[in-house]
Each structure stands twice: as structure tokens, then as C-alpha cells.
């Protein structure tokens, strides 16, 4: 009989720490519902004391999902734990995730403390959280660089204090796979009472070993893994949920199963990528667009003769539909709703109406609208909610002449117009926009991505600007790349307005 591995998803907490990937509460609920359908056991919904937005998101996610455990992160601080419990009040299944740094680097430089005092604080935090909930997870931050003997003392102490799960993070992504295996194995063999708690992995990808370390941790006895969709996360990211799930599905002989419905992996990946404006690299394992593509003649010949010559997974096992429906201007609202549902997105009727209006405009500009376009439309911010909107844009450009742009903006229902010339159409359009906004934001990053294939593609522009020492991120999408660029800049302006 197979052993059960619990999947703890931290896309909405650790994953959302990526610059430019912040979600609003409605989007977080959308992701949480998709994670529930995917079959994750635990959803880390946020760090409630960090901001009112995180606090509110944990509350609303707790209301929106039914069977997964909803987890809230805290430091080993009583006030953090108080606030976390308040945020979890509507959760059907609650978990508080508290902890403290245990490496000598953290003890000395972060806390200016001693090993003995850290254990005292760890025990106190665990006992305090236990007053609120039965399910308490304790994290030993930077466990990867904590010596095993001291780490075992901390783990034993918090289990005695009531921890039901103990998280052993490779916070800096420093561990080698064998080293991480040995660490988990050491704890399994040297901690008194280890059977009263589940050991959890939480590995970062700074050296590209997050999945290998997580897998080795499972082989050594960990029975919870902390992962994110697409491996997103701080710095180089976290262990990918899809990689661990499919490793275990492909290697059934290991005798370890998860509750993941793998056919939901690809739709969930696409939805998260779209909402967070973070493209999945083409060669990403499991969910990259090239993951099941074959360009070598030898490989193509083999696959045509028998798919198992070069494919160890059926694309349908991860939810890739080779017979994806292409929508046109004649497609109805029901067809759009169906394609969104297939891709893991279920919208309320009012939002669906607005997305359908955008779809019709796009369908008039393109011959065909595919799934990537549909997800882009669903993930785009609703313009009606923004203080600044693009009314019109006209650009004149050509070889050997300066580009000229005229732009019209609607700002809080007041109309403004301006014109400017520049070195190219995008430069001219942004200069005209700046004449109206009168805020000299500095462009720090500008990237263009094709959403799909073809000369009538939707182009997606990601932009980062700096104003008064703060960074703001925006994106725009349109079949016209100049319009997409202006929309991205306007998105940055609206993000600035929202935060101020």
C-alpha cells in the first residue's frame, strides 16, 4: 500500500513575494479555488500581520475554499500569532505556521541571540499558537545551514511543545541533495517523539536543486512538501508542485502517492502565469510549451512510430489538450466561458461579461483567439476600476522621420489630450502620456512577449518604473505593440495611485 505525501502549496505566500507578481484579493481567491480543484492538502494563504491586504486575503480565502487546510504564516511573536488566528476565523481547517531562524548566521546576525534562547522562543511560540489551534507547524528557518545536532534539539523541543508539523527549510538553496537527505534522515533517527509530527521540506532553487532536494527529503522520510505552481518564489524560486507530483506519478514503484489531480496541473499553471504576469519558460519541465515538443528528426520519427520512444508522460495526464478549441468573432459567451473553465478560470457573471466584451474586440482584430489569448484577457485588470484610462492613441511613424503620437486619457472622468515626437512610436507615445501625467517616472525594465503564434498575435508588455525611490510594475496586452506599451505604462501609474 502506498504512503501518502501531503502537498503544502505556498504560491499565495512565498510565490507572491516575486516582484511584480502581487495579486489582489479576488485574484488570490481565484488561485485558491484552482488549488482546491488541483487537490492540494494545505494552502498557505498569506502572512496576515504583514499588511491589511494579506490579512483580508486570508479571511476571504478561508471563506471561499472548503476542504484544504488554510495556513497563515507568523514569526515567533505573540502578536503575529494573535493576528493570524483572527484572519483564520472562517477557515474550516486551520493551521498556524510559526517559526524562527536556527542557523548560527541567523542566531548571531539576525537575532543577536544564543542557541538556548532560540529554543526557548521556539517552544514559547509553539505553545502560544497551540492555545488557538490544534494544527501548528513550526519552521526552522535556514535549517539547511543549521548543524544537525542542534537542529534535532530544536525539532524535539517544538514537538514536545505541540507542533504537529516541523518544516526543515533550505532557505538559501545551499544544500546538496545528499546533504539534505542526510539531514532529514538524521532527524528521523535522532529526535525523540519524531513519529508524533510530520517532517516537511521547503527548498529554494538558488543553485537549481530545489526539486532534487525536496525529492531526497521525501526519500529520507519527509511526508509533506512545500511547493509552488511553476516553481515561482523569492529569488530563484521554490520547488515546483508539478515536478514533484509527476515524479511520483511516473515512478509508482516508489510507493508514495499524492492527492493531486494531475490533469489540472497545466490549466492551473497557465492561470497562475497569466494572473501573476510571469511567463513560464518554454523548456520548463511539465508545463513549458516545449515540454512535449520534438524538433529532432530522429525524435520525431520515433514518436510517430510509438509515442513511448521519447515521451515518459502522456500530455493529457497533466491537462494538455491537443484538441484545443480556437475561438473566433462568431463564438458565443458560452464558448468563452467553457474555454476559461477548461483552463481553470471560473468568473462571476459580471466579470465574464466584461471579459467577453474584450474578447469580441480582440476577435475582430485577429482571425483566431486561442487559449493563451483568453487567459490574458481574463487576467488583465478591469479598466473601469482604474483612475487613468486610455481614451485614444494615434501614432505616425516611418523610415527617416521622427515618430509623432497623439494621446487621450480619461482621468477620474476628465478628458486630457497631448502630443509629442520621439525616437520611434513607443517613445513618442510615452512622452505624450508623460505630458499629461506630469510625473517623471523612470523606466527601469521593458519586455515584450508574444502571447501566441502568428503575425496578428497579441503582444504583452511588462514594464517596471521607478518613482520617488519605489518600483511599480505594470503590463499591457494588445495586437498593437505601441498600444500595449502605453497600457503597461498606465498600469504602472494606476499601481502608484492605488499604493498612495
Label every PLM stretch briefly.
Residues 4-5, 11, 246, 253-419, ...:
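A mid-to-C-terminal "edge-of-domain" accessory segment
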Residues 5-7, 17-42, 55-64, 78-199, ...:
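Alpha/beta enzyme core
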Residues 67-74:
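A glycine-rich helix N-cap at a beta->alpha junction
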Residues 175, 182-305:
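Catalytic alpha/beta core domains of metabolic enzymes, predominantly
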Amino acid at each position: 500500500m502506498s504512503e501518502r505525501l501531503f502537498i503544502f502549496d505556498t504560491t499565495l505566500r512565498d510565490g507572491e513575494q516575486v516582484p511584480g507578481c502581487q495579486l489582489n484579493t479576488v485574484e488570490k481567491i481565484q488561485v485558491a479555488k484552482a488549488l482546491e480543484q488541483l487537490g492540494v492538502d494545505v494552502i498557505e494563504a498569506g502572512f496576515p500581520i504583514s499588511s491589511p491586504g494579506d490579512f483580508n486575503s486570508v479571511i476571504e480565502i478561508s471563506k471561499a475554499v472548503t476542504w484544504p487546510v488554510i495556513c497563515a504564516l507568523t514569526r515567533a511573536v505573540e502578536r503575529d500569532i494573535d493576528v493570524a488566528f483572527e484572519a483564520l476565523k472562517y477557515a474550516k481547517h486551520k493551521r498556524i505556521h510559526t517559526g524562527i531562524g536556527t542557523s548560527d548566521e541567523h542566531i548571531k546576525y539576525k537575532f543577536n541571540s544564543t542557541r538556548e534562547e532560540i529554543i526557548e522562543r521556539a517552544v514559547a511560540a509553539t505553545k502560544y499558537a497551540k492555545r488557538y489551534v490544534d494544527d501548528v507547524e513550526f519552521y526552522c528557518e535556514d535549517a539547511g545551514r543549521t548543524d544537525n545536532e542542534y537542529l534535532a534539539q530544536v525539532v524535539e523541543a517544538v514537538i514536545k511543545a505541540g507542533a504537529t508539523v516541523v518544516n526543515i527549510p533550505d532557505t538559501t538553496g545551499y544544500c546538496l541533495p545528499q546533504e539534505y537527505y542526510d539531514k532529514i534522515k538524521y532527524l528521523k533517527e535522532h529526535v525523540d517523539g519524531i513519529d508524533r509530527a510530520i517532517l516537511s521540506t521547503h527548498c529554494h532553487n538558488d543553485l537549481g536543486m530545489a526539486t532534487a532536494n525536496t525529492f531526497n527529503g521525501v526519500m529520507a522520510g519527509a511526508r509533506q512538501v512545500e511547493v509552488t505552481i511553476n516553481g515561482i518564489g523569492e529569488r530563484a524560486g521554490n520547488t515546483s508542485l508539478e515536478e514533484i507530483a509527476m515524479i511520483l506519478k511516473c515512478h509508482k514503484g516508489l510507493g508514495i502517492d499524492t492527492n493531486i489531480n494531475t490533469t489540472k496541473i497545466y490549466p492551473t499553471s497557465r492561470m497562475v502565469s497569466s494572473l501573476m504576469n510571469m511567463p513560464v519558460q518554454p523548456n520548463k519541465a511539465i508545463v513549458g510549451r516545449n515540454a512535449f515538443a520534438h524538433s529532432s528528426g530522429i525524435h520525431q520519427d520515433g514518436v510517430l512510430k510509438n509515442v513511448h520512444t521519447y515521451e515518459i508522460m502522456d500530455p493529457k495526464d497533466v491537462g494538455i489538450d491537443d484538441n484545443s478549441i480556437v475561438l473566433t468573432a462568431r463564438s458565443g459567451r458560452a464558448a468563452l466561458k467553457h474555454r476559461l473553465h477548461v483552463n481553470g478560470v471560473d468568473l462571476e457573471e459580471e466579470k465574464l461579461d466584461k471579459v467577453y466584451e474584450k474578447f469580441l474586440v480582440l476577435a475582430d482584430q485577429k482571425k483566431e483567439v486561442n487559449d493563451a489569448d483568453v487567459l490574458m484577457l481574463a487576467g488583465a485588470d478591469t479598466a473601469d476600476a482604474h483612475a487613468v484610462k486610455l481614451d485614444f492613441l494615434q501614432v505616425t511613424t516611418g523610415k527617416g522621420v521622427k515618430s509623432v503620437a497623439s494621446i487621450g486619457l480619461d482621468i477620474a472622468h476628465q478628458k486630457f489630450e497631448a502630443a509629442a515626437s520621439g525616437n520611434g512610436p513607443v517613445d513618442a507615445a510615452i512622452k505624450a502620456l508623460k505630458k499629461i501625467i506630469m510625473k517623471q517616472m523612470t523606466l527601469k525594465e521593458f519586455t515584450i512577449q508574444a502571447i501566441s503564434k502568428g503575425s496578428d498575435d497579441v503582444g504583452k508588455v511588462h514594464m517596471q518604473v521607478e518613482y520617488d525611490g519605489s518600483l511599480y510594475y505594470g503590463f499591457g496586452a494588445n495586437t498593437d505593440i505601441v498600444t500595449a506599451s502605453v497600457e503597461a505604462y498606465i498600469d504602472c501609474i494606476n499601481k502608484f495611485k492605488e499604493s498612495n
